[in-house]
Every structure is written in C-alpha cells, then in structure tokens.
C-alpha cells in the first residue's frame, strides 16, 4: 500500500476504525496516515507548519508515517477538535489556545492582555520549562499531546468607526470577543461594549453593523476578508496567540518509542519554519491590508497596558499567580 492512500479501515464504522487504527499504529513498521485538522487553509501560517510537519514525518519514517490535512475546520470547530483528540475521534490538529482555557485554567494565560512584548519573548517562554509544564497539564486535563508550540500570532483590533490612538477611542464601540470571560473583561476595561459571539457569525455581524469591531492576527484578518467590512486596522498587539500542534494522547502512546521520537522530531523541525512563515505573512498582510484601503494606526501601547492591569490582577489567581508572573517577567 502506498503511504498516501487511506487504509481500508478508515472507511469502516468509527469504533472499528479506532481499534484497528490503534492496533495498526502499535506495530512499528506499519504504515499509518494521520488525519490533521486545521482552522485555516493550506497557504496560512498554520498550513505551512502542518505541511512541513507532514514532509518531515514522511522523510524520517521513510514513508511509513504520513498526514492527511483537513482545512478550514472541516473536522469541526476548534473546541470539538480538541475534545475529539482527547476522545480518540480526531487524530491530530492545530488549534488556538482559546478553547483550551475551558478545560485547563492555566491556558487562560493566553487570553490575558499584554503578557508578551514580542515574538522572541513568547517563543522563549513557550520553549522553556513553562511550556513543558503547560503541555503536561494538557495531557492530564485534555488527554492531548502537544507536539510543538506553533503560533497564530499577535492579535490586533479592526473596526468600522474610528482610529484607535488611545483606549478612550473605544468608548461606545460594539466589539465582538471570542467566547471567553477574560476577553470580555479586557475589552470592557478598554472602554468598549464587549459581546461574545461565535466565529461563524462575525463577518455578517460586522457587515450588518450589529458589531463595529473585532480582533485577530493579521493573516486571519486578511484570510476572511475583514477589510471588506472594516475601515480601520489598529496595531494594538494586545494578545499573543499560540496555535499548538497536538495529537490525541492515546494515539501518540500507541506508537512505538521509535515512532514517537520521529513524530516529535518532525514537529520540532517544522516549528521554526512555521514561526518564520507566520512573521513573514504578518509583514506582508500589513502592507496588503493598507493597499486594500484600511487605515493603519500604530498607537502608543502604554495607555492600553495600563487600562487592562485590573484584568490581569483579577484573573491571575485563576490562571496561577506564579505562571502569570513568570510569563510577564521571563528573561529572553
């Protein structure tokens, strides 16, 4: 059987498929295609990282292990995919950390505003013992194995009302947040009227003027054409979003030690490629979004940092005071 065709068992009923998959994976030397879920498409910062992972996996395993990527949430929304990996229904996937805070409080760290100053700060923290500790908590609380701390990037505000030069400029603006209490608190502290809303409804809400404002990394803002319904891009850089590449823990543990080592090595080889691509896309889309007619503003960030201090103080006990402090003050 060639390594890029599906084994017959994937067409069998799910329970049967799972037990066969586990059995097949348990025998080193058996060929295995790993289904991988992605929220965005193949040209995104996520796609570039996952495809590099697949390439290295095939090379290191001499064709025995390969991936089948499923783009644009085809296997379910991020929360369902994270749950699916834990239950053994989804093999592997990349997800923002947003839904993970619902399972493990410590992951709310990545919802907190102005924790990381720049990419180097975030990478150094995630690649340290703190990243390992969070990965351990994911194994215990979600039954998933974090293979590599890939990224979505820093999040920025867009709106259709005005430039943001100061938090006061957010007053009276109806802002959409992800379904996270931390994010609602953050945007209310900055002066906006914050409303949590499912991702699938956001574009229409902005188009119809039900919402004025949203926030996302630049590649996502470009990818979903927010420039069609938003006039202002404000480089608020308020949150750093990792996008961990993960595998169901039971599936990972079913591989031989040799294959586990290959999977981890492939992920580590893909990591710098993914992060570099993410930063390059950020620069490219900043230029392209301006060319598409968005007014780009780079506000002084100190007043924003100051305005959200109460949010960090409120949530630090939930996330863990030590973890929050370690992140903010991490030497890099």
Residue ranges and their predicted role:
Residues 24-28:
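Sec/Tat signal peptide C-region and signal peptidase I cleavage site
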């Amino acid at each position: 059987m060639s390594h890029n065709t599906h084994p017959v068992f994937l067409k069998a009923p799910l329970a049967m498929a799972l037990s066969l998959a586990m059995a097949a994976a348990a025998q080193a030397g058996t060929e295995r295609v790993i289904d991988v879920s992605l929220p965005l498409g193949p040209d995104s910062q996520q796609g570039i990282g996952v495809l590099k992972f697949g390439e290295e996996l095939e090379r290191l395993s001499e064709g025995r292990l390969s991936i089948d990527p499923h783009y644009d949430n085809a296997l379910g929304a991020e929360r369902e995919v994270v749950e699916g990996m834990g239950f053994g229904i989804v093999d592997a996937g990349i997800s923002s950390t947003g839904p993970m805070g619902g399972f493990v409080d410590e992951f709310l760290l990545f919802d907190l505003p102005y924790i990381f100053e720049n990419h180097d700060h975030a990478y150094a923290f995630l690649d340290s013992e703190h990243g390992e500790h969070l990965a351990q908590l994911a194994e215990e609380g979600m039954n998933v194995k974090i293979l590599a701390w890939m990224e979505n990037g820093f999040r920025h505000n867009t709106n259709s009302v005005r430039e943001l030069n100061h938090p006061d400029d957010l007053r009276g603006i109806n802002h959409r947040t992800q379904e996270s209490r931390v994010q609602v608190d953050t945007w209310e502290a900055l002066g906006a009227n914050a409303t949590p809303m499912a991702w699938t409804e956001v574009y229409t809400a902005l188009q119809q003027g039900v919402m004025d404002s949203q926030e996302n990394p630049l590649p996502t803002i470009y990818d979903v054409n927010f420039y069609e319904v938003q006039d202002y891009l404000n480089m608020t850089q308020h949150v750093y979003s990792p996008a961990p590449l993960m595998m169901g823990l039971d599936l990972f543990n079913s591989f031989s030690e040799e294959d586990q080592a290959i999977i981890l090595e492939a992920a580590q080889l893909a990591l710098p490629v993914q992060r570099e691509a993410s930063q390059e896309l950020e620069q490219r889309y900043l230029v392209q979004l301006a060319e598409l007619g968005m007014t780009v503003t780079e506000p002084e960030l100190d007043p924003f940092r100051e305005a959200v201090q109460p949010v960090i103080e409120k949530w630090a006990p939930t996330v863990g005071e030590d973890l929050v402090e370690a992140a903010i003050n991490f030497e890099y």
